[in-house]
UniProtKB/Swiss-Prot annotation:
Keywords tagged on the record: Viral genome ejection through host cell envelope, Viral long flexible tail ejection system, Viral penetration into host cytoplasm, Viral tail protein, Virion, Virus entry into host cell
InterPro entries recorded: Dit_C, Dit_N
Function: Forms the distal part of the tail. Self-associates as two rings organized back to back, with a central channel allowing DNA ejection.
Location of the protein in the cell: Virion
Family to which this protein belongs: Belongs to the skunalikevirus distal tail protein family.
Main localization of the protein described in the UniProt heading: virion
GO biological processes: symbiont genome ejection through host cell envelope, long flexible tail mechanism
Pfam families: Dit_C, Dit_N
A cellular component term, taken from the record's GO annotations: virus tail
Subunit-level organization: Homohexamer. Interacts with the receptor binding protein.
Name listed for the protein in its UniProt record: Distal tail protein
Length: 298
């Protein structure tokens, strides 16, 4: 598989426009630098050194840009539309895919050359340079459903160890439900194995006038941050995006949106960086997430 490049104008949004810059009529190739730069703070005396903090920076990426229109007029339009699509957004996202990985980088346009179209069809051959906002990260889609109590079935609930208990008897080969958890939400937890630096989520609240959201626990089970909203009316769903460059906390009832930032429980929202541990749903029937995990070098 030849490496593939695509540009997303709004990766987290429903209006995302995907530009295929590998196989489309505007193509990017020969990137100048997909790596990184590391600055090491080292103190030395008489050849003996002490290693301090390392700082990683991401250099600009420069691509060669080529248009493949059928005519001079089409090539002008391709060039114009491509640049305007990028300029119309605060930043865009580069998708970089090979046979062994698929990663993303958030970029801001820094420079693009503009010469004259050449050849029979008026093709443009230019250079385009991007400043790096965040590079690289993985992007995953996850869905979580709340665990609920089972329905009571006469003679077939709360079976323990295959023995009769309280009038209920275990029968081999029969399916049983379990019922009676007064704090069923404590079972709606999921392990987080790797750090998440930002995520976009759609949350589906259950009860009105009851805090709704998600909380995050460390390895010892202690809450270190939570995104929880206190609303009078239950929302159809809550849209959140913790990316510092594209932050959103928005409730939706039908086609009406509401800014939920003022009703967030700020005492519990301590950090946007999600660590290894667990996540728990609070007053939610379901949650859908698009999560981003950092990968400095690929």
């Amino acid at each position: 598989m030849v490496r593939q490049y695509k540009i997303h104008t709004n990766l987290d949004g429903t209006d995302d426009k995907v530009l295929d810059v590998t196989n489309g009529k505007v193509r990017l190739y020969q990137p100048s630098n997909l790596g990184l730069q590391s600055t090491n703070n080292i103190w030395q005396s008489n050849g003996i050194g002490v290693m301090g903090k390392r700082s990683i920076t991401q250099p600009q990426i420069e691509f060669k840009l080529e248009t493949f229109g059928e005519s001079l007029e089409e090539n002008y339009q391709l060039m114009k539309d491509f640049v305007n699509d990028i300029l119309s957004k605060k930043f865009v996202t580069l998708e970089y895919q090979t046979e062994i990985f698929q990663v993303y980088a958030d970029l801001a346009l820094a420079d693009v050359t503009k010469t004259e179209g050449y050849g029979k069809n008026g093709t443009f051959s230019e250079k385009i340079t991007f400043d790096i906002i965040t590079k690289w990260y993985t992007y995953e889609n996850l869905t979580f459903d709340k665990i609920e109590n089972g329905k009571v079935i006469a003679g077939m609930s709360k079976v323990y160890g295959g023995t009769e208990l309280g009038g209920y008897k275990y029968i081999e080969g029969t399916s049983y439900t379990y019922y009676g958890e007064t704090n069923i939400e404590r079972l709606s937890r999921w392990d987080i194995k790797d750090e998440i630096f930002s995520f976009m989520g759609i949350l589906y609240p259950q009860l009105p006038k009851t805090p709704a959201g998600v909380r995050f626990l460390d390895d010892t089970g202690n809450e270190y941050t939570a995104i929880v909203f206190k609303t009078e009316q239950a929302q159809d769903y809550i849209l959140i995006n913790t990316d510092v460059n594209d932050e959103v906390y928005q409730g939706w009832n039908g086609t009406t949106s509401l800014n939920l930032f003022p009703v967030m429980d700020f005492e519990r929202y301590r950090t946007r960086i999600i660590e290894k541990g667990q996540m728990e749903l609070i007053n939610l029937s379901k949650a859908e997430f698009k999560i981003k995990r950092k990968a400095d070098f690929v």
